[in-house]
């Protein structure tokens, strides 16, 4: 499967998906740690892809997403943004609302 097809499949199969370095429980550095912590505090199921284990996705996704950095949060096929946006939305209460609605819809 081509890398771009793999990315599209992951995004379509996971209503809430974060591309990050490491895993939510073992992030590789501060940005994915803060982003995944915010997601875990929302108490909804989400998927993740460790881009360190998938160098092809790490190379291709920034072009596909038109977003150069990681982590990247995707919700229902749309890029929400990276760490700063995730944290801003969380602090404003917007992330919790969005993710709860999406999780309920896909339960």
Curated annotation (Swiss-Prot):
Chain residues that bind glutathione: 21, 58, 70, 83-84
Cellular compartment(s): Cytoplasm
Q: Where does [2Fe-2S] cluster bind?
A: 29
Q: Which UniProt keywords apply?
A: 2Fe-2S, Cytoplasm, Iron, Iron-sulfur, Metal-binding, Redox-active center
**GO molecular-function term, one example from the UniProt record:** metal ion binding
**Domain (Glutaredoxin) ranges:** 4-106
Q: Name one GO cellular component term.
A: cytoplasm
> Is the Cell inner membrane keyword given for this protein?
no
Q: What InterPro entries does the annotation carry?
A: Glutaredoxin (IPR002109), GRX_PICOT-like (IPR033658), Monothiol_GRX (IPR014434), Monothiol_GRX-rel (IPR004480), Thioredoxin-like_sf (IPR036249)
Query: What Pfam families does the annotation carry?
Result: Glutaredoxin (PF00462)
Per its UniProt entry, which superkingdom is the organism in?
A: Bacteria
Query: Subunit structure of this entry?
Result: Homodimer.
Query: Which function does this protein serve?
Result: Monothiol glutaredoxin involved in the biogenesis of iron-sulfur clusters.
Q: Which PANTHER family match?
A: GLUTAREDOXIN FAMILY MEMBER, MONOTHIOL GLUTAREDOXIN-S14, CHLOROPLASTIC
What is the protein's given name? Glutaredoxin 4
Lineage, please?
Bacteria, Pseudomonadati, Pseudomonadota, Gammaproteobacteria, Pasteurellales
What gene is this protein a product of? grxD
